Amino acid sequence: MQLARLQRLVIDALEDVKGQDIKVYNTTHLSELFDRVILVSATSNRQTRALASSVAEKAKQAGADVLSVEGQDAGEWVLVDLGDVVVHIMQPAIRAYYALEEIWGGKPVRVRLGAPPAPAARPSRQ
């Protein structure tokens, strides 16, 4: 699956379950293992699990490989490995403590968050 399509699929899956503070980092210059790291915050263990399930389910439906899902038992930090894209779903305290944004560095990739606006309905002519 194309990287841009997989990245969009992940963002949409995270937004469907109300993931917060989504950041995407280009890691092609830092690692040969994956091209993107996506960080997202969740407000509870239940939400971290729901976000991970949403990402894994939508990836499978689209034909992408889900290589691994780790951390669901504890639920404070869940990692979903999709090969080219690695998703870290974290509660805010864990995210602040580990500061992965500093590790993956620099500026996040600019992506449009949220669904595109629906076209305005036109009144029917009768």
Spell out what each predicted region is:
Residues E32-D35, D81-D84:
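A short, glycine/Asx- and small/polar-enriched loop/turn
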Residues M1-H29, T43-A50, E57, E70-G71, ...:
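Long, contiguous binding/interaction regions
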Residues R36-A42:
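Short glycine-rich or small-residue beta-strand-to-loop segments that form or flank ligand, phosphate
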Residues Q61-V69:
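Active-site phosphate-binding and catalytic loops of NTP-dependent enzymes
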